[in-house]
Amino acid sequence: MPRTPSLPQSIITAQLNRVTSLSGLVPYSTLRKSAISKEMARDSFESTEDLQRRARNAPDGAFLAIDFVMVPHAGRTMEGVNYHYSGQAQTRLGHQFTSAALVQFGEDPVPLLERFKVSQALHTEHYPYRTATQEMIHVVQDCLAAGVPMAGLLLDGEFGRDAAVTFSREHQIPVLIRAKANMTVHFEGESLTLGALSKQFPPDRCHLYAEFGWRVRRLSVAREVGGFDVLIVWRKLHGEWTRFFLFSTFGGDGTVRSLLRAWKARWGIEVIHRFFKLRVSTPAGVVCHMTS
């Protein structure tokens, strides 16, 4: 007797066949549309139990990576969302999601959370508008409340630098964040941007980390919120040295090599985003099953 496919299997099969709505999913499942919606609602990224269950799949010593992903609409409407856009628009509109994952160098990323990040225009009591930094803090607090273990936070450049440092110290959670070249710091009695600081430390004045092929200089700097470390990272792209910057509150507990490995591990959340972007044009509930 053939085995009845589970709902997650039905969803995956449907999406492989380019299905982009709940209505289109029905022929691939033994359930009706209303029953599919109810089943999806039982397994969400929002509950404490879900966070705990997903976190159990992560390796020891994993870092919590938080980022945003924009998922474009599949057509003129997105089922279940009262939002339309002009077919004449030059830019395809979509919805922004907040995502979080536990990542570790050399290990598969473990998705923890995915939810809509609403605009000010769509603000409601149940779906409040938050800035990027407010959203990051909210996600971390949810994970802490669920007892999700984390060795530290890995954040991209859209999150507020000073607010992230303050939050890091208040909660004793170290952070590693990409910094922009125009970020101003105090270094050896001088106030200058990271871009200007990097000119004092070109590649030949930085240590080579052969594992990555990067040249890195770690410096102690300060801002109004206090002191922290900045990593000037030089890497070759198309034969030319280019630099990016990371700032860290890990202090002496993190070696440069371990910080670089942590940042490399952050790519895991980008891998998850590729999965979202390729397959997610349907309601958010579908994602819950596909990443389970």
Predicted feature residues:
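Short helix-capping/linker segments at secondary-structure and domain boundaries
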Residues: 17-20, 104-110
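Single, function-defining residue in the core of a domain
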Residues: 1-2, 8-11, 62, 109-292
